[in-house]
Swiss-Prot record:
Belongs to the alpha-IPM synthase/homocitrate synthase family. LeuA type 1 subfamily. Catalyzes the condensation of the acetyl group of acetyl-CoA with 3-methyl-2-oxobutanoate (2-ketoisovalerate) to form 3-carboxy-3-hydroxy-4-methylpentanoate (2-isopropylmalate). Pfam families: HCS_D2 (PF22617), HMGL-like (PF00682), LeuA_dimer (PF08502). Residues 392-515 are annotated as: Regulatory domain. Homodimer. It comes from Aliivibrio fischeri (strain ATCC 700601 / ES114) (Vibrio fischeri). HAMAP family: LeuA_type1. This is 2-isopropylmalate synthase. Residues 5-267 form the Pyruvate carboxyltransferase domain. It is an enzyme of class 2 (transferase). Its cofactor is Mn(2+). The lineage of its organism: Bacteria, Pseudomonadati, Pseudomonadota, Gammaproteobacteria, Vibrionales. PROSITE patterns: AIPM_HOMOCIT_SYNTH_1, AIPM_HOMOCIT_SYNTH_2, PYR_CT. Keywords: Amino-acid biosynthesis, Branched-chain amino acid biosynthesis, Cytoplasm, Leucine biosynthesis, Manganese, Metal-binding, Transferase. NCBIfam families: leuA_bact (TIGR00973), PRK00915.1-1 (NF002084), PRK00915.1-3 (NF002086). The gene is leuA.
């Protein structure tokens, strides 16, 4: 048996299901690039048949990612598999992941089929997927609650049909480590053709057991672990891949396995996912939380000063968290900014230095010192910015009292600059009234969040909104030292997305009319 554990990331598929609004194609591609840098073996980019947006995202990622295998999810249905194959065919290497429910409650109450029918459907799906690729993964949904005899039967049939990866999901996070490890061990003991496939596990965190269950499965012989960055996912989330990575690295002698991950990419990958998904990382989160390497107890601090090994089982540097000795100021040149980006591991083709430096100078003039985390935030937002944004904020002035606020803005609408002033219940409300008047969009805000992206009173603030327009949800984000400006950027992000969608719909309609 191989001692390498394959890392299968499903942040862009299972993880995204936890978000209030879908990520854009550009945001998903940024995350995919980060996962590729991290050394993830397989990236599950989406569920192509579920929507045109998901299909386009999977196709785009398949076109651009070269060093990770791209995977698309499908039900055990021919049209799903066909859609996945169509989206993935441009990839250097791809996998089709098909699944069907196998637990008694799912088979009887959801599928309303006999178990014989379910096995037949699974076999047909695997055989159909093999027409497109020799890399097929088959999942037994809700395997954790599936009678073991039925599970063994399904696994054997799927392998015979051509599946070379068999995934055993604890779909509702029901099992405990000894139990889940026992399920995997039983498969190895009872399925005669088990040596022809890699056993994978996909654990959810409803009882807080996802990481522990995954490790128990690895000890029982599983050689692929599925999960997400920061453990994001439906309900209580998924298995945290950064935790799996550092467990397998830190306890490699005991567990006897390894991964191909570049562990020093963990920190920035985690930050990127948190930022783009607008899901803050709790301070005490293992591996990537702000307090993960903090020591406040006097006894602990004394031990750390004498020998870090007294209380530190891994170093901040091992996940790419480095202390910054030199801060940047408005007097720092382009070379200094580039040097900091180089030290953080960013390549020149991952960002536009001219754009980044221009944004850096503006920020440095406002806050004095600029830190590495500021540069990262500026880079991520610059990468998301579209040059063809129709609406751009040129000027903002706020007057706020104890009761009401007045905001004046100048908004560039295409080539025309328009001015507006409004009174509102606070500066953000007044600003939004101005933008609504000038753009004419009737938008309903479902969610509004402000988070700090740096340290100190002059740190960057990020505004994230979820907006509803004509029944469709949009996610907008803005970044600035001024939270009012950041809030305006977030709303304009949404409105520009709506404007582009309207333009595309208009072009399509004209084509239909022409035909």
């Amino acid at each position: 048996m191989s001692d390498q554990v394959i890392i299968f990331d499903t942040t862009l598929r299972d993880g995204e299901q936890a978000l209030s609004a879908s990520l854009t194609v550009k945001e998903k591609l940024q995350i995919a690039y980060a996962l590729e840098r991290l050394g993830v073996d397989v990236i599950e980019a989406g569920f192509p048949v579920s929507s045109p947006g998901d299909f386009e995202s999977v196709k785009t990622i398949a076109q651009h990612i070269k060093n990770s295998r791209i995977c698309g999810l499908s039900r055990a249905v021919a049209k799903d598999i066909d859609a996945a194959a169509e989206a993935l065919k441009v990839a250097e290497a791809f996998r089709i992941h098909t699944f069907i429910s196998t637990s008694t409650v799912h088979v009887q109450d959801k599928l309303r089929r006999s178990y014989d029918d379910v096995v037949e459907m699974g076999v047909k799906a695997v055989k159909h997927a093999r027409k497109y690729t020799d890399d097929v993964e088959f999942s037994c949904e809700d395997a954790g609650r599936t009678p073991i005899d039925n599970l063994c039967r399904m696994v054997e049939a799927a392998i015979d049909a051509g599946a070379n990866t068999i995934n055993i999901p604890d779909t509702v996070g029901y099992t405990v480590p000894g139990e889940f490890g026992g399920i995997v061990q039983t498969l190895f003991n009872r399925v005669p053709n088990i040596d022809k496939a890699i056993i994978s596990v996909h654990c959810h965190d409803d009882l807080g057991m996802s990481v522990a269950n995954s490790i128990a499965a690895v000890q029982a012989g599983a050689r692929q672990v599925e999960g997400t960055i920061n453990g994001i996912g439906e309900r209580a989330g998924n298995c945290s891949l950064e935790e799996i990575a550092m467990i397998l690295k830190t306890r490699s002698e005991y567990l006897g396995v390894h991964t191909n991950l570049k562990h020093d990419e963990i920190h920035r990958t985690s930050k990127l996912v948190s930022q783009l998904c607008n899901m803050p990382i709790q301070s005490n989160k293992a591996i990537v939380g702000a307090n993960a390497f903090s020591h406040s107890s006097g006894i602990h601090q004394d031990g750390m000063l004498k020998n870090k090994n007294t209380y530190e089982i891994m170093t901040p540097e091992s996940i790419g968290l480095k202390n910054q000795a030199l801060n940047l100021t408005s007097r720092s040149g382009r070379a200094a900014v580039k040097s900091h980006m180089d030290e953080m591991g960013y390549k020149e083709d991952e960002y536009n230095l001219d754009t980044l430096y221009a944004d850096f100078v503006k920020l440095a003039d406002r806050k004095g010192q600029v830190f590495d985390y500021d540069l990262e935030a500026l880079m991520h937002f610059a990468n998301l910015r579209d040059e063809d944004d129709f609406y751009k904020l040129n000027y903002l002035s706020v007057q706020s009292g104890s009761v009401m606020a007045t905001t004046s803005i100048k908004l560039l609408c295409g080539d025309e600059e328009k001015c507006e002033a409004a009174v509102g219940n606070g500066p953000v409300d007044a600003l939004y009234q101005c933008i609504y008047k000038l753009t004419g969009y009737d938008i309903v805000l479902d969610k509004f969040d402000l988070t700090a992206k740096g340290e100190g009173e002059d740190g960057l603030g990020q505004a994230d909104i979820i907006a509803n327009y004509k029944g469709r949800k949009y996610h907008g984000t803005g970044l600035a030292t001024d939270i009012i400006e950041a809030s305006g950027q977030a709303l304009l992000h949404v409105i520009n997305s709506i404007h582009r969608a309207d333009q595309i719909a208009e072009i399509k309609q004209k084509k239909v009319e022409t035909v």
